[in-house]
Design a protein with these regions (language model features):
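Acidic/polar low-complexity segments and flexible, solvent-exposed patches
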Residues: 1-69
């Protein structure tokens, strides 16, 4: 069983969702974590994380080199 690891971090949930969609459009499954922290504190200290399977992290990093938010 693979663990989820952080591929990217953003200040706003919409930025994280766009990144997730970009990854998924390139065949890398991703989920967004910590959106609830934004509800209570805009630009929360934790940030909003985009998570991928550990086994997909290298591919996610390769794909994100071309990502322009």
């Amino acid at each position: 069983m693979s663990d989820l690891v952080e591929a990217a971090r953003f200040n706003r949930p919409i930025e994280a969702e766009l990144c997730r969609m970009f990854l998924e459009s390139h065949g890398v499954g991703a989920v967004v974590f910590d959106t609830q922290s934004y509800i209570y504190a805009e630009g929360a200290l934790v940030g909003v994380r985009v998570m991928v399977l550990d086994e997909d992290l290298d591919e996610a990093r390769r794909v994100l080199r071309d990502y322009k938010p």
